Amino acid sequence: MKFQMKMKSELCRTYKYWLILLVLWLSGVTQRETGVLIVDADCIPPNGCKALAYYRLKQGDDLEKLQGRFQTNNSEVLAYNPQLVDANSIQAGTNIYLPFDCLCLNGELVHRFSYTVTTNDTAEKVVDVTYQKLTTVGAVRSASNSGDLSSIYSGQSLTIPVRCYCGDPNVDPKYGLFSTYVVQADDQLTSLSTNFSVDADVISKFNSDTRNLSPDSIIFIPSKAANGSFPPFSGYVLGTVHWRSNVGIIVGVVVGGIVLAVLLLFALIFGFKHFRRRKLAKEPTMQQSGLLSSSSMAGSKPSRSGSTMLPVPKSVEFTYEELAAATDNFSLAKKIGQGGFASVYYGVIRDQKLAIKKMTLQCTKEFLAELQVLTNVHHTNLVQLIGYCTTNSLFLVYEYIENGTLDHHLRRRKSDDKPPLSWLQRVQICLDSARGLEYIHEHTKPTYIHRDIKSANILLDDNFRAKVADFGLAKLAEEGTGTGIVGTFGYMPPEYALYGEVSPKLDVYAFGVVLFEIISGRVAISSALPSENDQQSPAQNRESRTLTSFFEPVLNDPDGKTLLPKCIDPALNGEYSLDAVWKMAQLARRCTHQSPDMRPTMRFAVVQLMTLASVTQEWDVGYFSRASSQSQPPSGNDQL
């Protein structure tokens, strides 16, 4: 009877949960026009589109500078501007289209560009000159969460919102690409029609009032793609039923009823399975379903501690006595690492070197997460889990990685007798780490998000090949809003730090920060020192600065490549290919884009780094061949 009452209670909770979801889903279905049943969304289409900004080149502008300002690339710009035969010889006064992603943010179609203030900038200059009134000072103030922009300073980061438009199939489905255009003083509807090769009435029906065009106002003009034709509206597909009668409503109700029935059935099945899982998890026995694949550990015996953990395949359950003996009772001399909730010890069992992580009993969630991932995921660029123990504390036992963490090597002391990481080693470490992340993002079943990528969680073996470690915060790769913010500041993307939005692009952002670390040798967040001309004391003016903001001025500068060496780790002693470092910095910049939709996938990063590794190997051979041919013997750093 007690079991039946628990089962009934569990099913009731599950039923209510799914019923609430169904009601919310049905309430989102509205009839915007007679006979058109659509999912409620403030943007058309909800997933955004590609858009263009109409821009007149001014003196001193060039494509490289504009690409940084509008966060696009050379190939995209040339694709939408076939009149530009030579990108290096464009003149002031030339009108061009700058492509960007038009995104639905807070119910508005917009793109928020990131701009780093330079010397002599004012808010008005940034808006009126740099972005040619595609936005307003008020919009920048609101988007940047700044109360006052009357005194902006060099290095300050501003968010530049530029409105955009994707079209509307209910107005005219033949047009799906639009330019954001700032009305000039002498503009007339007829002149715009001529300049953009589009009928005046077409411009009028997509804009509210074109009879009295107001200077500096924004209008959206249908534009042609690279093939010379107007692309049709193609993004408005989510939840549409293009029937011109009330049949759409009937269909919606019928479908809703079917969905309700299916959801109730799934709720019953889910409730039963969920209850059974919880019941099994509380049983005080452990079934050992597999031993180590490593023959050197085959003699380890399963623990008889009566632990309450779930069965774990392909892992050994060590006894507490084994781990204590291997670490001299967890002595300080055997301690090789310390985190917020765990200590790591070195030990040897059956002649195999091991790293033993000791966690408090309060870390059950992190313990289970790492156990779940690493017992099911195996890759050469992911640290290997050997086994575990749940007596007295929670223990995870890993393969021992000889050269420790990446951050230790990047921030090595001058007294350290180990040489700094060479540029070739750094590129290989980036590629190895990217491959490990790509594997958990795309090739495992289920796929995972790490959520705590940082240089301290990348380990280097005796050949300085990288392995991603510490999966205590990993979760299934289901996009949505997380229940709590976890991870490390400096590596968190804005959508996660502010709103808790979780996706694989969270790891991509953190990986981009790691790339910046590898280039510069700096920490992800540091205290910025005041300039020499600052009248305040260093203590008064010291503030935290992220590594992304450290690189922004250089990457946004038209002479950024020339300025880049000041950002490069001095430990490299000039022994690197500037072209290769610049390409890695550009990849890091893409990975740390403010918008997750604009960040690449880890697969893209792997491909880029494979090319970079190949080029770097060729450079490395040539560089040291030239060095060895010189009459003077090479310095210590040349021998890396």
UniProtKB/Swiss-Prot annotation:
Span of the signal peptide: 1-31
Q: What class of enzyme is it?
A: transferase
Q: Where is this region: Disordered?
A: 286-308
The UniProt annotation places ATP binding at I336, G337, Q338, G339, G340, F341, A342, S343, V344, K357
Using the record's annotation, list all stretches that form the Protein kinase domain. Answer: 330-612
Q: Where is the active site?
A: D452 (proton acceptor)
Gene Ontology cellular component terms for the protein in this record = plasma membrane
Intervals, Cytoplasmic compartment: 270-640
Q: State which residue ranges cross the membrane.
A: 249-269
Record carries keyword Cell membrane: yes
* Protein's recorded name: Chitin elicitor receptor kinase 1
Phylogenetic classification of the source organism: Eukaryota, Viridiplantae, Streptophyta, Embryophyta, Bryophyta
Q: Which gene encodes it?
A: CERK1
